[in-house]
Amino acid sequence: MLLTARTPSRYASALGALSVFMAALLLPLCFTGGVMTTPAIQQSLGGSPAALSWLTNGFMLTFGSFLLAAGVTADAIDRKRIFIAGAALFCLSSLLFCLTHNLFLSGVLRALQGLAAAMILASGSAALAQLYDGAQRTRAFSILGTVFGIGLAFGPLLIGFMIDAVGWRGVYALFALLSAGVLLIGLVSLPAAEKSEPRTPNNLGLTLFTLALMLFTASLMVIPARGFLSLTTLALLIASGGLFVAFVVRCRRVNNPVLELTLLRHPRFVGVLLLPVATCCCYVVLLIIVPLHFMGGEGMSESQSALYLMALTTPMLVFPSVAALLTRWFSPGQVSTAGLMMASAGLLLLGDAFHSNHLPQLVLALILCGAGAALPWGLMDGLAISAVPVAKAGMAAGLFNTVRVAGEGIALAVVSAVLTASNTLTLQSRVHGYAPEVIHRAAGWLGAGNMPQAAALLPDFSLRVLRESYDSAYTLLFSGLAVVTLLCALMIWLTLCRKGGAIQTRNSGS
């Protein structure tokens, strides 16, 4: 695994790469850790489903909203400074999370972790690119992707066993320890930015975009607790819409826009932007709701649920390489479309498995979803860059990553709203003698995958009624996710695979 550095100090560069690799391991651990620790935190600190959801929502809200701003700032100022600042913020917020006894403060600290993650992700890849050239750079980024995949595949298992052994506070102590290592190693080994012409970022454009995206995502996140037509939801939607309009106007009027809107005139690039939307529906969303189902709906421990979740995550270690091999004979668009169709079948099978409570079928469905999503996963970044002119590749990559991460937060908010709404409608039609707010709270717990809490609110009704509501909500959700994934696959086929739209790639006959 030795890499030849482009800088005079080979070992300093190797240490710098190590800090980036450690960060690549930390981010997926933190993402899945927020989910796996939620039931334990609820038992320790209490809280409603809406309050507990911010342990995940808070992280995704700031992670997605600040990613573009962090990347632009890193390019304009110094990638090392942004990377180190992000690691320091991550370490501090994780350490404070270990000590907190307040759920609201926990949500705030998770939001700070999301901001720190955006800073680390946006600057880490660029910092790694400074260390190596040519084939060695390719190898370094291959290792980076592998480490990220390992964190995603085995992170839930590690965290599940840690919760069983030392509790949720020990998990966040591990995050603090890892981020401290990233901070110290990166501080002494990453090279400072090379002197170049100073660039002033479009601060107003970045602010408008970040606030618009944050308010829009927040408006979706409050729907389960407030309702779609509530004053809070509508105010957030209107404010985000106004900010998006102002952002578009700003982009049209300045010479150095945050985003060149002409990128969206490239049909292939629009098709590529649908890839993270599809993989979010058939993979990332499942990383959240499946372990919550295992722990709250099936009564499994954290470590048991993590073992079953590996059916979803393990294919991510293997199938990206399979996808790269398949591009010798098929175009990336064709491979991606086939993978999404496989994942759609897995989602439909998953809905039936939830309803029938057939565990082997559920495991098979998770494998199909994981393998199907993994096929386009390793091809997406290259497709994003190749779908636009070379001069706009950097901006295209920035927009693509923003859509990927922000889309995950938006999708999770929509999923939560759908599950809560479906359970609310079912319970309102079948449960009588309880106040509407009690029924809504029970529906919220069912939407969060917590059957015991819902049953405690409705003690006069059998678990069978709650289970039927729970199962029908998930069946509806998985059917909807399958439809969205299939529609994305169709659009990707039309934009990337049809004659005149396919992105050229080397095949076996070339």
List each language-model region with its residue ranges:
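Hydrophobic transmembrane architecture of multi-pass small-molecule transporters
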Residues: R404-L494, G509-S510
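Central cavity-lining transmembrane alpha-helices of secondary-active solute carriers
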Residues: N57-G71, S125, M310-V322
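Helix-loop-helix hairpins in multi-pass membrane proteins, especially solute transporters
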Residues: L67-G205
